[in-house]
Amino acid sequence: MTSLIRSERVAAGLLLLAAVVGLVVANTPAGPGLLAWADGHLALPAIGVDLSLRHWVSDGLLVVFFFIVAVELKHEFLAGGLNSVSRALVPAIAAVGGVVVPALVYLAITAGSGLERGWPVPTATDIAFALGVLAVFGRGLPAAVRVFLLALAVLDDLIAIGIIAVFFTTGLDLGALAIAVAGVVLFAVVGRLGVGRTGAARIAVVALLVLVALVTWWATLSSGIHATIAGVALGFALPRLSGLRAAHALEPASNGIVLPLFAFSAALVAIPAIGLAELAPAFWGIALALPLGKLVGITAGGLLGAWVARRRGSAGGLAVPDLVTVSLLGGIGFTVSLLMSELAFAGLDDVRDEGTLAVLLGSGVAIVAAAVTLSIRSRRARRAGAAADDDDATRDDFPAHADGGPARA
């Protein structure tokens, strides 16, 4: 069961199902009651935490997802596809293009509206969803496509984490921040002490790590920095192999519980009974910037990166059709974009709801466009592979020289 939930296809399917169910239920007669329940608060006075149920998911449970993202980032930088400048160059430039162009598209559409603060929303790529769509529709494509998408999404996540840390930190409490930093350092020390431990000693180390992680989360939340940054810092703090083991253990919970719950709670939005002309500019900015901005930005960045790489004597990246396909997958914002919308439009409930709908619409357009393109590319790749296999079989079965001489290749 856990191996099934780890599947990229299943993870993407659960995310999509949860979002659809949340959106549908929110617009039924049960919707108002469910929305009121989701916005109800659950307080822990002893530690000074008072969050709505939505925020317990986005500020609490989602930390697990960001911990796993940080572990994957660290692995890619130390031993994966980003462990050298030459390997990281093209996806890095493509990732920058995939952030800058959507932000510019959004700002161009919302200029003068007072809603420019939402520019980070269309800059994110949902790594789990994008890889899931690729796994479903991209069979037979070169392995380099998945490697490039993974590197691109990892770098995109790194930029998104930086945006959250820099632009969504308010009222910094230096005392709480000091506790959070101390917690991360202690987490790193305990993590290294746990290397090679077995039995009761290993259980004790894991229990201590969980306790330190909870304290670090509380201190980060109290400091004014978004709590998901705690997950990022803790993920980077663990030794690489220990982090990979921890991420592997947490992945079923993240894919099967955390991400679907977040998608469900974020999609609990009542569709406004207004005309298209009455929608806020932020809606159009996000809905267009995700599929269109990402397509243009990643493609242009990838082509620029390939040119720079060739000038340096390195490999030039993907073929243009595959780069366009990856660019469409990059337009699937979903998880991180939904979080960005929640943060950017805090206090503007109507705009936040429209932002959520725009993320769902823009990501949906990107999913459909990517699925169609992947299906076409995949069909051609499988056909080319079958033709090559037939050609090889013909050469083996019918040598050019029947007299025992060498067959001609």
Curated annotation (Swiss-Prot):
The keyword Ion transport applies. Keywords: Antiport, Cell membrane, Ion transport, Membrane, Sodium, Sodium transport, Transmembrane, Transmembrane helix, Transport. One of its GO terms (cellular component) is plasma membrane. Belongs to the NhaA Na(+)/H(+) (TC 2.A.33) antiporter family. It catalyses: Na(+)(in) + 2 H(+)(out) = Na(+)(out) + 2 H(+)(in). It comes from the Bacteria. The keyword Electron transport does not apply. Na(+)/H(+) antiporter that extrudes sodium in exchange for external protons. The chain crosses the membrane at residues 10-30, 60-80, 89-109, 118-138, 148-168, 171-191, 203-223, 224-244, 257-277, 283-303, 328-348, 356-376. The gene is nhaA2. It is a multi-pass membrane protein. GO terms for biological process: regulation of pH. It is found in: Cell membrane. PANTHER family: NA(+)_H(+) ANTIPORTER NHAA, SODIUM ION/PROTON ANTIPORTER NHAA-RELATED. Residues 384-409 are annotated as: Disordered. InterPro entries: Na/H_antiporter_dom_sf, NhaA. This is Na(+)/H(+) antiporter NhaA 2. GO terms for molecular function: sodium:proton antiporter activity.
